[in-house]
Swiss-Prot record:
Positions of the UniProt region annotated as G2: 37-41
GO biological process: ribosomal small subunit assembly
One GO term describing the cellular component: cytosol
Gene encoding the protein: era
Residues binding GTP: 11-18, 58-62, 120-123
Name of the protein in question: GTPase Era
Highest taxon above the source species: Bacteria
Location relative to the cell: Cytoplasm; Cell membrane
Pfam families recorded: KH_2 (PF07650), MMR_HSR1 (PF01926)
Stretches for region G4: 120-123
GO molecular function: GTP binding; GTPase activity; ribosomal small subunit binding; small ribosomal subunit rRNA binding
Domain (Era-type G): residue spans on this chain: 3-170
Stretch list, region G3: 58-61
Length: 296
């Protein structure tokens, strides 16, 4: 008997959805940063074992949108809860349910498939706190399963996989067994660069950073030559991203190259520039160019 199912992971921004997906896959597939809303596109990630295949839709965090990009991200996350076989609602036990959590719960009540409550970061919180949070959420809605985990340390991840297998239906293998992601290489390369920029810039530049890959060519020796722009919204952000004597941009390129080489399994040369595009997050045509679907 072979089973297959589509799973979506929801939760407020920065709760650890991408880290959980990485722990399940044991691969660095989804951009992980300390900043909220760093996952912008629905990324279908495929886990294939001997007797099942799980297709994960990694979504942006659900939040109150402030611009066109925010609207896209919220709609993307809401749409992902439709037509799936299982929903994982990820929370942190050290945070009481806020308006964002209550908003998600109201949507989850309309879902016709099993919903798991997954408590992350249990290694960072006392058992009493975890138990208290469990009680609060259990009174808000009924969950098919409640699983405490540590995504970062991999605690109870195997248990979570076993429970997901239990709930998904019998079905075909939708993707080849060696396929782990349905996004193209350019998309992943752009996400790697953006992650490094977000990490290195910390609080110096607001969240309005995007990456466009201008060129990605592989020569006869198997070496990739990549060129791209880091987009920011204000002229004042540009020198911050570049850094003194180009030091910051050089570090972004260096750290990104290391991860891109690991992903492509090839030597990589990468050149990056910084370009100002004011209010790009409200520019529908530019969002489309960067790979964000048009809002319906």
């Amino acid at each position: 008997m072979f089973k297959s199912g589509f799973v979506t992971i929801v939760g407020r921004p920065n709760v650890g959805k991408s880290t959980l997906l990485n722990a399940i896959m044991k691969e660095k597939l989804s951009i992980v940063s300390c900043r909220p809303q760093t996952t912008r596109n629905n990324i279908q990630t495929i886990l294939t074992e001997d007797n099942y295949q799980l297709v994960f839709v990694d979504t942006p965090g659900i939040h109150k949108p402030k611009h066109k990009l925010g609207e896209y991200m919220v709609k993307s996350a809401s749409d992902a809860m439709k037509d799936v076989d299982l929903v994982l609602f990820l929370i942190n036990p050290d945070e009481k349910p806020g308006r964002g959590d209550l908003f998600i719960i109201e949507q989850l009540k309309e879902v016709k498939v099993p919903v798991f409550l997954v408590l992350n970061k249990i290694d960072e919180n006392p058992q009493e706190k975890v138990a208290e949070t469990l009680k609060i959420y259990s009174e808000l809605m009924e969950f098919e399963e409640i699983i405490p985990i540590s995504a970062l340390k991999g605690k109870n991840i195997d248990l979570l996989k076993e429970l997901m297998f239990k709930y998904i239906p019998e079905g075909p293998q939708y993707y080849p067994e060696d396929m782990i992601i349905d996004q193209n290489e350019r998309f992943i390369v752009a996400e790697i660069v953006r992650e490094k920029a977000l990490r290195l810039l910390s609080e110096e530049v607001p969240h309005g950073i995007a990456v466009e890959i201008l060129q990605m060519k592989k020569n006869e020796k198997g070496t990739y030559h990549i060129e791209g722009n880091i987009l920011c919204e204000k002229n004042s952000h540009k020198p911050i991203i570049i850094g003194k004597g180009g030091s910051k941009l050089k570090k972004i390129s260096q750290y990104a190259r290391q991860d891109i080489e690991a992903f492509l399994q090839s030597k990589v040369y990468i050149r990056l520039w910084v370009k100002v595009k004011e209010e790009w997050r409200d520019n529908q045509s530019l969002l489309k160019e960067l790979g964000y679907k048009k809002m319906k």
